[in-house]
């Protein structure tokens, strides 16, 4: 019996942590503010475990069948938690209600497990030996789950299937327990019947995960979903309405094919026109290849290095028929080298010097993205530039996130760069901002590529003029130790979205 229960501890601790990770990941995907979501969920989950541990004192008789019933309950609720959350988001206005109800319920049930196990085993071992073994196995199981969740389960199986898999593991513990633990025959029959019912539901859920995911995402997106993919880093959704293609990453719109040219022409061409002879170009982010498409319109460019973290994005936009048509197969051009790694780390290790650097990172909605807009990042980037090099970075909206925009501009300027703020109206986004910078005052050539849809000499002058409601405001410099930009961004966009 001891061995069976020790193995159970290893499994159930893994399951408990995975349910917590699933809730935090889904909440951060759907609501943003990763740090806030994980902090609230972890705190609520741990508090609920404490409540469960306290409630365990009221379980006095038949502890072994009660332990197995707890496992069945956790398997059922935890296994379906991802599906419930995805389906709730599109149907319930206050998504936080089902989110925290599930976290509290799972936390209480998980909190019951270890105290009940300790009481079952108390006659088998000395107390100090019992506690050390059970708790050490509990922590080992949590470690295994924390390693395998981001590396294997989330990217390979997706969040919904991962939930069902661990629910099945919980039920497996209960079913196995009916064979290896001492139970009355009547209890064995009841528990096995319950286990089979719950197991069947979880297997059906696992089998229909794609259908559940499709239905839940259909309720979130008004247009037809033509591609849905979970990667190690993000959820990719591509939608289509007539001839319009839209890309969403973690629920956030990245571009619409109807007007993306306004964004990408403004991101790329001012920088290349600000350099006398741009030959080597570095693109950080921009795995969709749309910025690279614009770069290749400058015939004097000899090489383009694209560094994007997620290989799934660059592969999709290299191979998918509709998507590679959008970027005119730019990622397959012989001038282009694609590198899939962390941009910050790559810059630290590289010794190359570039004429133009274009930065198309996601908005600084969390601290892991916010670090890419800090003085530390731009200082590292500056080592990959010479006195004639220029950089341009997308800088969120100067209208909706005014302090965020000027925080990025001031951070770059604090490192000795001459900066030129730019903005453009993109119908699918609204007013959007960029910062162009170099170690010399910015001066433009006038030899525009011929096939641009939006940018010309007149528009280049126009996008440099900021109206009063987007003009400069006093802001902090964004550093690694203060992450002021993330605070500005959260405050401003939450105000708009509420």
UniProtKB/Swiss-Prot annotation:
Chief place of localization: membrane
* Pathway in which this enzyme or protein is active: Amine and polyamine biosynthesis; spermidine biosynthesis; spermidine from putrescine: step 1/1
Chain spans, region Spermidine synthase: 196-446
Q: Where is the active site?
A: 360 (proton acceptor)
Membrane topology qualifier: Multi-pass membrane protein
Gene Ontology molecular function terms on file: spermidine synthase activity; thermospermine synthase activity
Q: Name one GO cellular component term.
A: plasma membrane
EC number(s) reported in the record: 2.5.1.16
Pfam families according to UniProt:
Spermine_synth (PF01564)
- Cite the binding residues for spermidine: 264, 288
The record's listing under PROSITE patterns reads: PABS_1, PABS_2
- One Gene Ontology biological process: spermidine biosynthetic process
Show where the PABS domain sits: 200-439
Keywords in UniProt for this one? Cell membrane, Membrane, Polyamine biosynthesis, Spermidine biosynthesis, Transferase, Transmembrane, Transmembrane helix
Q: Which reaction does it catalyse?
A: S-adenosyl 3-(methylsulfanyl)propylamine + putrescine = S-methyl-5'-thioadenosine + spermidine + H(+)
Enumerate the Gene3D superfamilies for this protein: Vaccinia Virus protein VP39 (3.40.50.150)
**Which InterPro entries does this one have?**
PABS (IPR030374), PABS_CS (IPR030373), SAM-dependent_MTases_sf (IPR029063), Spermi_synthase (IPR001045)
Membrane-crossing segments per the record:
7-27, 35-55, 67-87, 97-117, 134-154, 163-183
Binding positions (S-methyl-5'-thioadenosine): 234, 308, 342-343
Query: What function does the entry list?
Result: Catalyzes the irreversible transfer of a propylamine group from the amino donor S-adenosylmethioninamine (decarboxy-AdoMet) to putrescine (1,4-diaminobutane) to yield spermidine.
Complex and partners: Homodimer or homotetramer.
Name by which UniProt lists this protein:
Polyamine aminopropyltransferase
